[in-house]
Amino acid sequence: MSQLSRILLLNGPNLNMLGAREPKHYGTLSLAAIEANVQALAAKNNIELECFQANSEEKLIDKIHQSFKKVDFILINPAAFTHTSVALRDALLAVAIPFVEIHLSNIHKREPFRHHSYFSDVAEGVICGLGAKGYECAFEFAVEFLAKKA
């Protein structure tokens, strides 16, 4: 029997406030509800999914490093770190785990400082502006990506 594929869902700063934080941009679902939706997809697809959220760059980097040779794919919403964190980008490059960048809002329809991402050019794909549905789309892509590698 083959080993389960492992996917890590990472969420960056302030995403623990989803549901209460700026619903116009981020919707009304909590992070727990989004994670539960993705966990349900993981169960249907026989995928091991770990969810992790941190407001600190250091904790996110440590989690990425701990995933080295233990995780097959990463789904990441770097949140505000999208526009500032070379260190987080470098951590993803160091572990060489394929990943998809996710954003609830369309960062290109927002303030100009949100238009640049330090992750997009090294991600397998970028999903933005689809709200919580973007997490499901990213998960489905990861499943297809891993199936092609198998």
From Swiss-Prot:
It holds the Pfam family DHquinase_II. It comes from Mannheimia succiniciproducens (strain KCTC 0769BP / MBEL55E). GO terms for molecular function: 3-dehydroquinate dehydratase activity. It catalyses: 3-dehydroquinate = 3-dehydroshikimate + H2O. Homododecamer. The active site is at Y26, H103. The keyword Amino-acid biosynthesis applies. Belongs to the type-II 3-dehydroquinase family. This is 3-dehydroquinate dehydratase. Pathway: Metabolic intermediate biosynthesis; chorismate biosynthesis; chorismate from D-erythrose 4-phosphate and phosphoenolpyruvate: step 3/7. Its EC number is 4.2.1.10. Substrate binds at N77, H83, D90, L104, S105, R114. The gene is aroQ. The keyword Amino-acid biosynthesis applies.
